[in-house]
């Protein structure tokens, strides 16, 4: 099992001062969170979520990535990897290393990080994920979730609220999915790492009038925003980053957008590590948000009155666009060009609707 340790050294006086300052600030703001000041220096211990050791051994993706019917291993990765770049895939598909006499996968699935089970979907036909588990990781900054999908069965003793340890067996690999399932020969684990958009998901879902019941509450896939697990794992293995906070801090900005609002979304209250500067003591007047190529809002800057002067409340303004990356990620619609300027595209609009409650 892959597990690397890193011991960070801190100056006690400086750490104590930062803790006291953070605590004072949280009391002033009346907020229930603060960020551990040493979190940028801590190195995560994590594990690959299946018995397939190919990635740990440095072998190519064909040794572990389960392709679609196309047969292309790239189609099992994260990003615009399907339908000639026109379809987004929000995770990694990991093939099995063991099968029984019937050809069914026997691989056990491991918790990639210590955490708390937040959701288990036990009715495979109700989601494209099939049977899936979501684990939140409160000990990580920010508190990302990991998702494990297309499972055959859940391990006995694993339930919502269960605390799981690093590498603990949580399930068995399968090929469950809505809409008829996945052929046994293409059984795999679909693995995601990401952030939850909003605790107000039910309001957005009702407003959208999809015509079907939300069977999965907050852990509906539409409320989950993934990062590229392989990119993070590569950077972690190469020691370019030690943890998720460093990874988000180094993320590439593709679209920068301003939202004129006095709201502080629950998203940034849950993930305060994404703040680029402290919240003001009073109300905010707006937000400047940096998004990566898939629309993940990874950097947040609160704005004061002077920075949104003359702008209509609840309005959205594109500040900058890295056009080459937008073109490369054509499976995502982050912006639409309007002459010499840009407006929000469909995927960016959805993210802002979810997080800010814009309607």
Annotated model-derived regions:
Residues 95-98, 146-155, 175-180, 210-216:
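Short helix/strand-bridging catalytic loops that position acidic/His residues to coordinate divalent metals
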Residues 127, 132-135, 162-240:
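Conserved, short, structured surface segments that act as functional micro-motifs
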Residues 41-131, 215-358:
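Surface-exposed, glycine-biased beta-strand/turn segments
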